[in-house]
A protein has these predicted regions:
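FAD-dinucleotide binding site
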Residues: 1-150
Length: 150
């Protein structure tokens, strides 16, 4: 029996596992999917070194005021850079009409991570004992029986 069961291997679950591991606590993580990351999903760019070039299919940006993610990125050695925001915005509406006269930059000030958001997932996962990480294990029931959770 473990002290803590973490349900979900997204960024929050991995951060919890990381904090518990660094504090010397006993924990176990269950993730229903066969991969870690939750909504963070990055696709490897073909013909590039593994992890060097990815594009994000889930969250892609973070902001300067998100100090927790920036601190985590620094601790994991993940390079942070500014989102390119120069140039003009091209917008395609639902009917397929293009507008090129828009002169605003919705992502100005946004930050990106080298290797995509997946770099945070990989960095956290690398520091965890893999025997405590259970992939492809959906949890369908939690019960308190005989003084313990099962």
């Amino acid at each position: 029996m473990h002290d803590v069961a973490i349900i979900g291997g997204g960024l929050a679950g991995l951060a919890a596992a990381d904090a518990l591991e660094r504090a010397g606590r006993d924990w176990v993580l269950f993730e229903a999917r066969p991969r870690l990351g939750g909504r963070i999903l990055s696709q490897q760019v073909p013909d590039e070194p593994q992890g060097a070039a990815r594009y994000d299919l889930g969250p892609a940006w973070l902001w300067p005021q998100n100090t927790r993610l920036l601190t985590l990125a620094e601790r994991l050695g993940v390079r942070v850079f500014e989102q390119h925001a120069a140039g003009r915005l091209v917008f395609e509406d639902g009917g397929g009409a293009l507008r090129r006269d828009l002169d605003f930059h919705p992502m100005a000030g946004a930050l990106r991570l080298e290797g995509g958001m997946r770099a945070l997932v990989d960095g956290l996962a690398a520091g965890l004992p893999q025997a405590k990480v259970n992939l492809g294990k959906p949890i369908s029931r939690i019960a308190f029986e005989d003084g313990a959770y099962t």
